[in-house]
Swiss-Prot record:
GO cellular component: cytosolic large ribosomal subunit
Protein family (similarity comment): Belongs to the universal ribosomal protein uL1 family.
Pfam family, one: Ribosomal_L1
Coiled coil: none
Gene3D superfamilies linked: 3.30.190.20, 3.40.50.790
Keyword terms: Repressor, Ribonucleoprotein, Ribosomal protein, RNA-binding, rRNA-binding, Translation regulation, tRNA-binding
Protein source organism: Erwinia tasmaniensis (strain DSM 17950 / CFBP 7177 / CIP 109463 / NCPPB 4357 / Et1/99)
PROSITE patterns: RIBOSOMAL_L1 (PS01199)
Gene symbol of the encoding locus: rplA
GO molecular function: rRNA binding; structural constituent of ribosome; tRNA binding
Subunit comment: Part of the 50S ribosomal subunit.
Single Gene Ontology BP annotation: translation
Protein name as it appears in the record: Large ribosomal subunit protein uL1
Amino acid sequence: MAKLTKRMRVIRDKVDSTKQYDINEAVALLKELATAKFVESVDVAVNLGIDARKSDQNVRGATVLPHGTGRSVRVAVFAQGANAEAAKAAGAELVGMEDLADQIKKGEMNFDVVIASPDAMRVVGQLGQVLGPRGLMPNPKVGTVTPNVAEAVKNAKAGQVRYRNDKNGIIHTTIGKVDFDTDKLKENLESLLVALKKAKPSQAKGVFIKKVSLSTTMGAGVAVDQAGLNASAA
């Protein structure tokens, strides 16, 4: 059996894996256990009541968190003409067409989000094998293929998170940083859960949001009692 590190022993002793914590208690525990030398992210795992094997029950989308994620996001936009100018004005770091595609093919990928206008997809389509595996391929379902690229850039900069269930029907994303106020983390979590409820597939039956767990980048998961969250989100 592998020897537990001091940090792992502390987490094991502090976190009751059988308990669902009130959101305020859960966040306080995460803050107490966040001892890394950097500001850790607060991540969420949401177990959904779906059959992930069925394509018509998969959940995918994006939402802007009210208090952002605490991350500085670099945005690349494929657009031309007025759309390109609008993207630059909205704060996009990289804007182009074939020239931007050439940079990416060379491995120059200093960005976190890729947005494209519909007419630019003829260029972006050539980059599927590069962008796809990294989760960067623009997609209309998450608002990254859009005629309004300026709005998409602003959303990305404002703290938009994209979500997609994995093969086990679990959504993994981030809701902020461990140094956020508890209320801000709570409101971000509630906002995400509201968005997920709106995205519930009609084919999904029974309880949709089955379990919510929070963790920090280097920490253990803490299950959250949904009763302590906004009723419209639970």
